[in-house]
Structure formats: structure tokens, C-alpha cells
Regions:
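Membrane-embedded alpha-helical bundles of multi-pass transporters/translocases
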Residues: 2-147
Length: 147
């Protein structure tokens, strides 16, 4: 007699999900905790300008998250039957987050704190956060499918 397949999550799956989500959050907090200090102290960005940039970023982030979810749904609708919906996005986000985080803190101070420095830092933050959004939406949606 064959045993019925159980839909219960194993400890391996629970730990694997938690470890994956922890990795993404670790990267986000590395950038978020030190970003303002790095930009002000190392790159000499004015605090008022930094606050304005962060306001603009948060408005973009409010639009970006649903947009990324829609892109994932559209791409999955065109995928072959049986294809993973979230795994490709989670795996693609890893190098994007890594490159974005390393490059963000490698913005050369020789740019002098002017427009070039601010633009470079802002673009690199967008790159990092795009990778984080890909990973976070994939992981968050995966949780609903696992349950």
C-alpha cells in the first residue's frame, strides 16, 4: 500500500524559508542602517538634500512594490506549465542585491559630494532596492503558497 502524500511543511522547509528571508533582510539592514551616515560623513551630502532624496525614494518604493508584483504575475502567466513562479526571481535578486550593496558603499569620495555623488548613490540605491524588492516579493508570495 502506498502512503498518502502529506501537505504538512517539514522542519527543513521552514528553516530553509527562514534562512532565505533572513539573508535578504540582512542585506537591506546593512544598507539602511549605515546609508545616511555614510552619505553625510564620507560623501559630504547635505542632510536636507538627503532627506529629500529619501522622500523621493519612499514615494518610488510605494509604486515599485506593486509594479514588481504585477511584472512577476505577467511573466509567470507566460511561463511553461509547472514552472517555478518565485524561484527565478529570488535567484536573480541575489547578484543584483550584492552588486548594488557593494557598489553603493564604493561610490568614490573624489566625486566631491556634488551632483555626481548624489546621483551615483541614488542610482546604486535603486539597483540594490530593485534586487531586494524582487527577493522580498518572491519570498512573501512563496509563504502564501507554502501555507
Amino acid at each position: 500500500m502506498t502512503k498518502a502524500k502529506s501537505d504538512k511543511l517539514t522542519l527543513k522547509h521552514i528553516i530553509g524559508y527562514g534562512a532565505g528571508d533572513c539573508g535578504g533582510c540582512f542585506g537591506l539592514y546593512m544598507v539602511s542602517m549605515f546609508m545616511a551616515r555614510f552619505l553625510q560623513v564620507n560623501l559630504e551630502v547635505n542632510a536636507a538634500l538627503l532627506a529629500t532624496i529619501l522622500l523621493i525614494w519612499n514615494i518610488w518604493d510605494a509604486v515599485n512594490d506593486p509594479l514588481m508584483g504585477t511584472i512577476m504575475d505577467i511573466c509567470f502567466a507566460k511561463a511553461k506549465p509547472g514552472a517555478d513562479k518565485f524561484r527565478p526571481w529570488i535567484l536573480a535578486s541575489i547578484p543584483i542585491m550584492f552588486v548594488g550593496m557593494v557598489a553603493f558603499y564604493a561610490v568614490p569620495p573624489m566625486l566631491g559630494g556634488g551632483f555626481a555623488t548624489i546621483a551615483a548613490a541614488f542610482i546604486l540605491k535603486i539597483v540594490f532596492e530593485a534586487g531586494y524588492t524582487m527577493m522580498n516579493i518572491g519570498m512573501g508570495s512563496l509563504l502564501g503558497n507554502m501555507a
